[in-house]
Amino acid sequence: MTLFSSISSLSSSMTSSRSIFASFGSGTIMGSNSISCTVGSGSCGSGSGGCGDLTGGAKSSGGSCGGKGGSHNHGHGHGPHGQGGKGSGGSCSC
């Protein structure tokens, strides 16, 4: 019984860490083990460090979480743990 509850707990924690959404204005991007990052209000990610590598997923650096500037700017952040979010305008630099 103890083993089952441990497996169940581990399974549910893995599932929750893989289903984090990253939404950008009108479009929504979902990536496994990616940090959520919302563009619009200037806030970026969650926890200290903004879009840090909290779940072992994507980690971006240098204008991460998409582009900075006008509506025609589409930025891609690439980090050591995979590809970061994709943004269209707004300011979301972590």
From Swiss-Prot:
What's the protein name?
A: HssA/B-like protein 53
- Provide the organism lineage as a comma list: Eukaryota, Amoebozoa, Evosea, Eumycetozoa, Dictyostelia
In this chain, the stretch annotated as Disordered covers 58-94
Q: Which Pfam families match?
A: Coiled
Q: Which InterPro entries match?
A: HssA/B-related
User: Per the similarity annotation, which family is this?
Assistant: Belongs to the hssA/B family.
Gene Ontology biological-process entries: sorocarp development
Q: Where is the composition biased (Gly residues)?
A: 58-70, 80-94
